[in-house]
Amino acid sequence: MDATAFPYGLRVLVVDDDPTWLKILEKMLRKCSYEVTTCGLARVALDILRERKNKFDIVISDVNMPDMDGFKLLEHIGLEMDLPVIMMSIDGETSRVMKGVQHGACDYLLKPVRMKELRNIWQHVYRKKMHEVKEIEGNDSCDDLQILRNSFEGLDEKSLFMRSDSDTMRKRKDVDKDHADQESSDGNTVKKARVVWSVDLHQKFVNAVNQIGFDKVGPKKILDLMNVPGLTRENVASHLQKYRLYLSRLQKQNEERILGAARQDFSHKGTSENLNLRSSFQEQPSNIANGYPHASQNIQTQANMLDSQLEDTKSTVPLPVPDKKRTLASDAADSQNVTSASSLGGVLSFKSMPVNQDRKPSETMILECQAWTGGIPSKQFMQYPKHNHERCDLLGDYSCLPKPDLEHPVGPSNLYAPPPLISMSCGMEGDARDFSDVKPAIMDCIKSLSPALTCTVDSVSVQLSDSVVTSIDGDLKSSGVDGLPSIKDCCLDQTNSQGSLRPSQEPSIIGSTELASLPEDLPSYPLHGVSLENIGLSSIDLLNYSDAMILSGLQSNWYDDLEFSSEMMDYPSIDECLFASS
């Protein structure tokens, strides 16, 4: 066997309580040219090691022994002799192997032990010796370096008294340089020179990164491309890592800035939209009576439009109203058409009438109402009644009209749109005045419109432009006014050039009705138990009426067979009549 290939004379101590395995291991180790000493007990082996200190290079011990655990023996050897110990056992459980390694075993062998494993145990001895040599050399070099540093510091203290400050700084730099040379010459304490990344050096680095590509960049490629003497791969790798962190931080800051600006714009836009929406909701009419709800949102919208037009009024004519409170009594036949508070005669809803097709729809909404006489413009007025569960005196409190010009003839051809709001108060039997109390100017106006009027009492059929509106039967009676026929059932057919009246029963005189006094020359129509309200500009809806009414020639389109009961309305029942126009 070649002596250079294998270390001869390695001193080995074998400890095992099994004599058979002890003999086998001794023979195998001697074949490897090792010097072998055997022992059957752990305590005996420990005594041998203490007596023959520094006479053994390595110890091989079994884990399971009767007098002492193998791990306990391992601890004693590691503390007292500091020798490499190899543990062996039949049981190869992982927990036991890990326990041996944790206690300081350099290897763990399983029985039966192979020859190859025993032949390589010298490596553990060699590693142990190398560590000892390095520790000794390290301690010696540290002592030498400490001596040099002390001498240099003493030299610096002397130079403080002998030279100026500038010379002292120069000397200190030279000494530091000498220290660096000494440390670099020492192989055990090698200290790398620190690289200062100047502006030019960093610019070369950035140019190399851009040339290679940020996705494909690597320290070796950058180092080769920069070609700077004294620059190592570790320096480039460290600087590349810092450069990547710097770029990621910049990108994060830009993203946060963009998101912050977008969030600010969104919040500003949302605030403005909320303000606009809130202002639109706050534009509700402030003069709506307490507890007087509306039937639909369209009515409330039209009320807002009419309230905005009231600001332009310059002169008003108040209408006197009787002071006495009256209640509207309902007949048994009309009980199904009234609400729980009082009877509601009906509501006629005027919407936009496509009379003048030349005007645009947007102009129609803001167009001032033309007067009934000769197309003279007049102001538009509308107010809402206060609902106090009593009789609403609409004429005296809420209605006012400009004085019309009676010089111009009044007729259906001169009507452009429905008239402004005219509120009329009509009572029932018991406390009333005859129509003869109305001023002659009103009577003349009604007479002039008599060819286009239609009166109904019990059953009414009004037909305008091929549209029929029917009413609910009522038991009230009506009377003519100054030559107008009093009819209980009549029909107006607009297909003929002149209206025709078809009486079906004998006319009867009105019992006890009352009409509130109107201003002079008021171009209005008496209406009993009916409420007309302008809530749109496109159609006319008949809701409900049960008493006699007189309508002038209205130039509009009427919806067919639209009839609603007052119970479907959200309005509380009122005892007056409303004419509304726009």
From Swiss-Prot:
Span list, region Disordered: 166-187
Any single GO CC term annotated in Swiss-Prot or TrEMBL for this entry: nucleus
PTM (free text): Two-component system major event consists of a His-to-Asp phosphorelay between a sensor histidine kinase (HK) and a response regulator (RR). In plants, the His-to-Asp phosphorelay involves an additional intermediate named Histidine-containing phosphotransfer protein (HPt). This multistep phosphorelay consists of a His-Asp-His-Asp sequential transfer of a phosphate group between first a His and an Asp of the HK protein, followed by the transfer to a conserved His of the HPt protein and finally the transfer to an Asp in the receiver domain of the RR protein.
Domain Response regulatory: 11-126
DNA-binding region (UniProt annotation): 189-248
Predominant cellular place of this UniProt entry's protein: nucleus
GO biological process: cytokinin-activated signaling pathway; phosphorelay signal transduction system
Positions with biased composition (Basic and acidic residues): 166-182
Keyword terms: Activator, Cytokinin signaling pathway, DNA-binding, Nucleus, Phosphoprotein, Transcription, Transcription regulation, Two-component regulatory system
Subcellular localization(s) per the UniProt record: Nucleus
Pfam family, one: Myb_DNA-binding
GO molecular-function term, one example from the UniProt record: DNA binding
Disruption phenotype annotation: Dwarf, narrow leaf, low tillering, late heading and low fertility phenotypes.
Residues modified as 4-aspartylphosphate: 62
NCBIfam families: myb_SHAQKYF
Free-text function comment from the UniProt entry: Transcriptional activator that binds specific DNA sequence. Functions as a response regulator involved in His-to-Asp phosphorelay signal transduction system. Phosphorylation of the Asp residue in the receiver domain activates the ability of the protein to promote the transcription of target genes. May directly activate some type-A response regulators in response to cytokinins.
Protein family according to the UniProt entry: Belongs to the ARR family. Type-B subfamily.
Protein name, UniProt field: Two-component response regulator ORR26
Gene: RR26
